[in-house]
């Protein structure tokens, strides 16, 4: 789901038409037309700004109508309901942050849709995609609609939601996809409860999401390796910050990434590995991409 972050004027774009995290549907700025002067009346014109395009740096006017960039003018511009003079400024597109934890509902004192999206806007992020591990987790249509209602009233930027997969029944995943969930997420560590998935369920959900044209995001760590190493850390009395690194070895991530890549290849599912930290994981990602597999 992707929505305008304005409570008084909400637009909904189904995920089939707009995948913020899918590399299959990327707008190529090189294809934007350099429009001639015309008599159109549009919503917004940002004039005299510097724009960095694939062809080089261009000074001109950005023409926006109905929420979309419709062209670039090098000299004059059409009439507009709002004109922004960007003389001396660089015009940049708003960034999309597809991995956001706003903790709302459940723990709004940590961060909620207002405080989180206010910070996003200040940093140039104009679309946030919220993760499912809130309380309740976004694993049912009821929880999805609850979070949507909260975001409608608080969000200052555009937003979308990732549904939880884990061991969630497939009928619920289908309902979430139909409601507009942009993607789904599973964890490979048991402490994430209903968001954690066995290998069998991981494969079955990948097959379903391939049919639904939704990516699966994975927190990829070998839970057994992590748990046993953490037991060693406690037994050794280590409490320093580096203990977290020493007792969470690269192989725990690398093995899980390889497992996910293998299952996703079998299911023909778009796989997205979240927050990779090991060089060996990057090597596996590059190898999978070189074979033509859709993994990011």
Per-range role (PLM):
Residues 171-296:
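Histidine/acidic residue-rich metal-binding segments in metalloenzymes
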Residues 49, 67, 88, 99, ...:
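Divalent metal-coordination and catalytic microenvironments
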Residues 150-164:
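A glycine-rich helix N-cap at a beta->alpha junction
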Residues 86-154:
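Metal-associated gating/positioning segment near the N- to mid-region
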Residues 130, 160-163, 270-275:
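Short catalytic-loop micro-motif centered on adjacent basic/acidic residues
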Residues 110-117, 167-176:
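Short, acidic/polar
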Residues 34-93:
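Histidine-rich, glycine-flanked metal-binding segment
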Residues 2, 6-8, 13, 17-19, ...:
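Intrinsic-disorder-associated, low-complexity terminal segments enriched in Asp/Asn/His/Tyr and depleted
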């Amino acid at each position: 789901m992707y929505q305008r972050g304005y409570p008084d004027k909400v637009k909904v774009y189904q995920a089939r038409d707009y995948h913020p995290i899918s590399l299959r549907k990327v707008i190529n700025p090189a294809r934007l037309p350099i429009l001639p002067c015309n008599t159109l009346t549009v919503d917004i014109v940002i004039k005299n700004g510097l724009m960095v395009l694939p062809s080089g740096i261009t000074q001109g006017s950005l023409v926006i109508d109905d929420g979309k960039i419709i062209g670039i003018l090098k000299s004059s511009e059409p009439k507009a309901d709002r004109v922004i003079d960007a003389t001396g400024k660089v015009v940049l597109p708003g960034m999309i942050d597809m991995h956001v934890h706003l903790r709302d509902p459940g723990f709004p004192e940590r961060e909620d849709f207002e405080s989180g999206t206010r910070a996003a806007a200040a940093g140039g992020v104009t679309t946030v995609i919220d993760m499912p591990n809130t309380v309740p987790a976004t694993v049912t249509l009821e929880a999805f609609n609850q979070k949507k209602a909260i975001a409608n009233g608080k969000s200052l930027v555009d937003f979308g939601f990732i549904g939880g997969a884990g061991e969630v029944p497939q009928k619920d995943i289908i309902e979430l996809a139909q409601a507009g969930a942009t993607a789904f997420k599973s964890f490979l560590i048991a402490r994430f409860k209903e968001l954690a998935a066995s290998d069998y369920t991981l494969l079955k959900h990948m097959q379903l999401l391939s049919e639904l044209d939704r990516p699966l995001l994975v927190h990829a760590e070998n839970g057994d390796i992590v748990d046993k190493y953490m037991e060693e850390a406690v037994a050794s009395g280590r409490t320093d910050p580096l203990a977290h690194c020493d007792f969470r070895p690269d192989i725990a991530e690398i093995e899980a990434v390889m497992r996910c890549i293998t299952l996703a290849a079998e299911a023909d599912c778009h796989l997205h590995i979240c927050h990779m930290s090991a060089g060996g994981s990057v090597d596996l990602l590059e190898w999978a991409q070189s074979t033509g597999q859709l993994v990011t």
